[in-house]
Amino acid sequence: MGRHLLLLLFSILYMLLCQASSSGVFELKLQEFLNKKGVQGNKNCCKGGLTTSYQQCECKTFFRICLKHYQPNASPEPPCTYGGTVTPVLGSNSFQVPDTLPDGSFTNPIRMNFGFTWPGTFSLIIEALHADSKEDLTTENPERIISTMTTQRHLTVGEDWSQDLHSVGRTELKYSYRFVCDEHYYGEGCSVFCRPRDDAFGHFTCGERGEIICDAGWKGQYCTEPICLPGCDEEHGFCEKPGECKCRVGFKGRYCDECIRYPGCLHGTCQQPWQCNCQEGWGGLFCNQDLNYCTHHKPCLNGATCSNTGQGSYTCSCRPGFSGASCEIEVNECTGNPCRNGGSCTDMENTYSCTCPPGFYGKNCELSAMTCADGPCFNGGRCADNPDGGYFCQCPTGYAGFNCEKKIDHCSSSPCSNGARCVDLVNSYLCQCPDGFTGMNCDRAGDECSMYPCQNGGTCQEGASGYMCTCPPGYTGRNCSSPVSRCQHNPCHNGATCHERNNRYVCACVSGYGGRNCQFLLPDRASQIASDVPWTAVGSGVLLVLLLVVACAVVVVCVRSKVQQRRRDREDEVANGENETINNLTNNCHRDKDLAVSVVGVAPVKNINKKIDFSSDHDDLSLTTEKRSYKTRHAPADYNLVHEVKFEVKHEVKLEHAGKETTMANELSDSCEDIKCQSLQDSSECTEEKRRKRLKSDASEKSKYSESRYSESKYSESKYSESKYSDVSLYSESACASACASASTSACVDTKYKSVMVMSEEKDECVIATEV
């Protein structure tokens, strides 16, 4: 037991030491399991019964795998130092082990990862167990064990599988296994780590055993050093990537093998950076002083002799026929045209030669073999004999040459200026001047303003350099031909855009500015809205007050309408049967006037105790009535002892009341016939004849009165609604009074309302009493 514990501790220590530098996987592939009888290791049926000749037990088989360090006598007891696992139920009795299960709970081969160097040996224990159910996979119960298979082997790292077959009792298990390194791990124990990379930490790939293989252009242990350009100076050059050669400070060149001289050094060399070692013949700090100019530069040309005269100076001794500081100029003896009379000159070394035309001879062809007798002069030239022999011609104006054979071209010297055209004359020339210039050679500016060059009303002024136009406002240019841009002086402010339209400018303002030149800052919209709020509130208040006033007016109109409606309703109620008492009135009545107060036919008269106008309305003939007006001879009678009663005639009666009045008139005529008159003094009776006479008299008088009161009738129309019932009553009373006319005081009794009209003959008074 102590030995086993020691081995276990040793294995754990070994794994801890190797874990950080190695990695691999032990793979176990279960292939086939056979349990022909379907019994457990104790030979009992997996379901608890004994096996018989005609019945086979069913063993739901799963496996427990334990991988340990090498043990001569491997024990299935934990711990499993290299790893272990329990599979789900893979089949019953004899079956082929699948690669996977549908639910993904099992993968074949079984992988057990290593974090340490593979030792090369192992112990493998595989137990086949029976499960009562697929969920119950406990391994502690020994009665569930079907068989136990133990293997101790030596195993090298590789991709090849090792096959194995174990037979225990009535069971048989076929399986295979191998140990492979993880990615980037190599070697016999997967202890060599190598991961290919191409970055600042290295540029390499890995070999079969994990060795580093540098990429092209790289070197070093981890391939971090680039290989520079071949030939690059290892001391004075370096490279950051393969194939280049960068020089260190003080060196230059393709291979960084040249030192840099001192700045400004002209004719010197260096052995180390920043030196200036002068070459032979040069001196000074920068080796710029030539101590042997003739040797270094050879400045003298054309065979001249050079002599050094000091630092950077020399003198050339020229050969004949050459001149200049370096004898670079060849002297041409023909430059002065030494040959005369048309002879041609040939330049020779340090001399010249003239080739004379026929008839001439001499070094410069100055002698002629002809005489004046030969007439050699042309174009009117005068011939004269030369005392030395020969002749000479005196040419007229405009001709030249030995024989006056050449016509002089006066325009050959281009005497005309300012683009004038030159015309050659016999003895002179003529310049045709362009506009604006005068003079023989067209060199003077003429009167240019005479050509009116200034346009658009400009004023022309002559000047020394030509004319000048003073332009009117709106135009510019030399001739005032260009209109001035209105936008030229940028009249628009605050970033606005200027546009020209119809000889004026328009400014397109940016947002927030206004005015002709966009010079005004417009108020912010939010502040403007805020400033509008009080005026909105005031306007809302005024509108609310107006609505309230209108509402009050509507209410007042409605109330007044209801009051008038109620008044009409009360009058209708009175007309339907209510009796009111009319106070005794004292009136000055005249029998010749149809003045009476009637209470017959329509409704009782109210006691209103105030002056009131009585009017009677009569419509057209279709209503069988006519308008009438009554007026007393004296002051009108008043109710309640009031001394005036006015009678007015309506000229317009509403159609809705016409029917009522017509009915009242009919009732009046019927009632008056039934009135019985009694004399208060002598008890005389009214006759029908007297009543008719009285009615005729009244009718004529009413007609006259109607015409005189026509203007007053309009005023009575406005009061028709308030006095319509009183007017009808007056009409009825008048008719009744006429019917009851008598010489003596008489009384009229209204049989319907039991009213009595008393008329006094002496005072012409009418007293009306109503019995209540």
UniProtKB/Swiss-Prot annotation:
<feature type="disulfide bond">
    <location>
        <begin position="214"/>
        <end position="223"/>
    </location>
</feature>
<feature type="domain" description="EGF-like 6">
    <location>
        <begin position="407"/>
        <end position="443"/>
    </location>
</feature>
<feature type="domain" description="EGF-like 5">
    <location>
        <begin position="368"/>
        <end position="405"/>
    </location>
</feature>
<dbReference type="GO" id="GO:0005509">
    <property type="term" value="F:calcium ion binding"/>
</dbReference>
<dbReference type="GO" id="GO:0045746">
    <property type="term" value="P:negative regulation of Notch signaling pathway"/>
</dbReference>
<dbReference type="InterPro" id="IPR018097">
    <property type="entry name" value="EGF_Ca-bd_CS"/>
</dbReference>
<keyword id="KW-0221">Differentiation</keyword>
<feature type="domain" description="EGF-like 8">
    <location>
        <begin position="483"/>
        <end position="519"/>
    </location>
</feature>
<dbReference type="InterPro" id="IPR011651">
    <property type="entry name" value="Notch_ligand_N"/>
</dbReference>
<feature type="disulfide bond">
    <location>
        <begin position="181"/>
        <end position="190"/>
    </location>
</feature>
<feature type="topological domain" description="Extracellular">
    <location>
        <begin position="21"/>
        <end position="536"/>
    </location>
</feature>
<dbReference type="GO" id="GO:0005938">
    <property type="term" value="C:cell cortex"/>
</dbReference>
<feature type="domain" description="EGF-like 1">
    <location>
        <begin position="225"/>
        <end position="257"/>
    </location>
</feature>
<dbReference type="GO" id="GO:0005112">
    <property type="term" value="F:Notch binding"/>
</dbReference>
<feature type="disulfide bond">
    <location>
        <begin position="278"/>
        <end position="287"/>
    </location>
</feature>
<keyword id="KW-0245">EGF-like domain</keyword>
<feature type="domain" description="EGF-like 3">
    <location>
        <begin position="290"/>
        <end position="328"/>
    </location>
</feature>
<feature type="disulfide bond">
    <location>
        <begin position="454"/>
        <end position="469"/>
    </location>
</feature>
<feature type="disulfide bond">
    <location>
        <begin position="318"/>
        <end position="327"/>
    </location>
</feature>
<feature type="disulfide bond">
    <location>
        <begin position="411"/>
        <end position="422"/>
    </location>
</feature>
<dbReference type="InterPro" id="IPR000742">
    <property type="entry name" value="EGF-like_dom"/>
</dbReference>
<dbReference type="GO" id="GO:0005886">
    <property type="term" value="C:plasma membrane"/>
</dbReference>
<dbReference type="GO" id="GO:0007219">
    <property type="term" value="P:Notch signaling pathway"/>
</dbReference>
<dbReference type="GO" id="GO:0033504">
    <property type="term" value="P:floor plate development"/>
</dbReference>
<keyword id="KW-0812">Transmembrane</keyword>
<dbReference type="GO" id="GO:0060113">
    <property type="term" value="P:inner ear receptor cell differentiation"/>
</dbReference>
<keyword id="KW-0914">Notch signaling pathway</keyword>
<feature type="domain" description="DSL">
    <location>
        <begin position="179"/>
        <end position="223"/>
    </location>
</feature>
<dbReference type="GO" id="GO:0055016">
    <property type="term" value="P:hypochord development"/>
</dbReference>
<feature type="disulfide bond">
    <location>
        <begin position="433"/>
        <end position="442"/>
    </location>
</feature>
<dbReference type="GO" id="GO:0060034">
    <property type="term" value="P:notochord cell differentiation"/>
</dbReference>
<keyword id="KW-0832">Ubl conjugation</keyword>
<keyword id="KW-0472">Membrane</keyword>
<dbReference type="GO" id="GO:0022008">
    <property type="term" value="P:neurogenesis"/>
</dbReference>
<feature type="disulfide bond">
    <location>
        <begin position="449"/>
        <end position="460"/>
    </location>
</feature>
<dbReference type="GO" id="GO:0008593">
    <property type="term" value="P:regulation of Notch signaling pathway"/>
</dbReference>
<comment type="function">
    <text>Acts as a ligand for Notch receptors and is involved in primary neurogenesis. Can activate Notch receptors, thereby playing a key role in lateral inhibition, a process that prevents the immediate neighbors of each nascent neural cell from simultaneously embarking on neural differentiation. Required for boundary formation during segmentation of the hindbrain. Required for midline cell fate specification prior to germ layer formation; regulates specification of floorplate, notochord and hypochord. In inner ear, it prevents adjacent cells from adopting the same cell fate.</text>
</comment>
<dbReference type="InterPro" id="IPR013032">
    <property type="entry name" value="EGF-like_CS"/>
</dbReference>
<keyword id="KW-0524">Neurogenesis</keyword>
<dbReference type="InterPro" id="IPR000152">
    <property type="entry name" value="EGF-type_Asp/Asn_hydroxyl_site"/>
</dbReference>
<dbReference type="Pfam" id="PF12661">
    <property type="entry name" value="hEGF"/>
</dbReference>
<dbReference type="GO" id="GO:0009880">
    <property type="term" value="P:embryonic pattern specification"/>
</dbReference>
